């Protein structure tokens, strides 16, 4: 049986234990002080990062956990996972709701609860392919920016002690709409830092996260389909466990208006094709590198069930707008690399006036209301703001 955690540690991150364990241990008293007995709301908590965040923070014993997600099956699996994890503390008051955080029913629930001490938002479009046309782009901006602003307005009624919203390396020097939306999200939450404490984190790929290329390797094997991966793109990776720990540390230990990122050197980058090679070897296969998708599909369809040779296709990346490299900060941002052994912190982040954000969001909503709104119009508006 393939142990995904061990595979990630041995073949992708090249560390069997989390790089954030020392910082968690060094700050355990403060983490417990800030979390124990507090109420916790996690939006998008059924996803890979959200669920990992929950498992990272539960040992510090919040009194209440409410999880929101549109994925009903994901919430069911989250509950099974929590209850099946040996020794994991689960609050006596634990509830999940399948709903959209932008819906009126969420507002009603939030107001009845009179807010939460800790709020973490992981609900976001995450794939660069989500920007292929005007419909996809509008959905991306609606979710990552406009709905997120409405959430912040709602939180202002009952300000949390800690608010965290996940970002991405794509927000540093954005070159695509996904990155632009996340950069705008960062600007937006910083504008609300006068109302309550806000923090965020930029980090890279989460190995085998839901919907990722690597998670797709497992699906392809299960369906006896060929594997495909770019061979010219190097990426930083963290494990699912580490992704939750980054967010937990930033959320609880960060000062108002700070952005966190993992300390990962370029030597930690790895290609997807290299991971694919290691994945097949771990499963006991030799790869057959095919020249085309059609050749690979044919080979997979015709190979016997007990074949130890598996078809792959490696290619040059063609995802429009994908960055050829990753960066967690840009010149001009003030860095603190001393506070944590595993995390860097961007301090004194510049803040736009909230009135400027309000005007921009009004412009976006007016643009989306036009019957002939085009992708180019949205891109122009984003560029003008940034």
What are these regions (language model features)?
Residues 56-67, 83, 89-90, 99-142, ...:
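NAD(P)H-binding glycine-rich loop region in Rossmannoid oxidoreductase-like domains
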Residues 121, 125-142, 146-183, 191:
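Conserved Rossmann-fold NAD(P)-dependent oxidoreductase catalytic core, especially the SDR/UDP-sugar
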Residues 96, 140, 163, 198-201:
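Hydrophobic/aromatic anchor residues within beta-strands of the central parallel beta-sheet
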Residues 40-60:
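N-terminal Rossmann NAD(P)H-binding glycine-rich loop of SDR-like oxidoreductase domains
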Residues 1-39:
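Non-catalytic terminal and boundary segments that flank Rossmann-like NAD(P)-dependent oxidoreductase
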Residues 30, 189-386:
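Strand-loop microenvironment adjacent to phosphate/nucleotide-handling motifs in alpha/beta enzyme folds
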Residues 43, 68, 119-123, 163-168, ...:
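SDR active-site strand-loop-helix element
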Residues 69-74:
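Helix N-cap at the beta1-alpha1 junction of Rossmann-like dinucleotide-binding domains, i.e.
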